Amino acid sequence: MEKLDKLSEAFKALLKQEKFGSQSEIVTALQELGFENINQSKVSRMLSKFGAVRTRNTKMEMVYQLPAELGVPTTSSPLKNLVVDIDHNDVLIVVKTSPGAAQLIARLLDSMGKSGGILGTIAGDDTIFITPTKVTPVEVLMQNVTELFESSF
């Protein structure tokens, strides 16, 4: 296992203990596990990367914790696992995704461009608005987008 993979696994294992209330406590714990070159800024980046949040544990202490949801999506995640729902009205399509996946999927949709019938997208954390081009009926684009996510693995 690569050193970075070992660090990631150790980091996640520490957060699952739900006892670290500060980044400096995480730094100290990782250093005790043999990761000498770890510092607060690296821990901060890892907390963001893994979607960790501060929440109260069973003892009512504020601690860092990994989300219970799917976690942060990666480019290797199957797209159909990231899309929760697709719906439309007369003018646009709304795609609901797992938390954190909307911008990744919107980027893919934007790459289809006008030739794919997409004028543009707007993405939040878990929602994407898709506007069709003038020449593409929203129902046709809805079908194309749905097929895209059903056929991707």
From Swiss-Prot:
Keyword presence, Transmembrane helix: no
Keyword Transferase: no
Compartment annotation: Cytoplasm
Pathway(s) of this molecule: Amino-acid biosynthesis; L-arginine biosynthesis [regulation]
Swiss-Prot/TrEMBL keywords: Amino-acid biosynthesis, Arginine biosynthesis, Cytoplasm, DNA-binding, Repressor, Transcription, Transcription regulation
Domain of life: Bacteria
GO BP term (any one): L-arginine biosynthetic process
Chief place of localization: cytoplasm
Protein family membership: Belongs to the ArgR family.
Record protein name field: Arginine repressor
UniProt gene name: argR
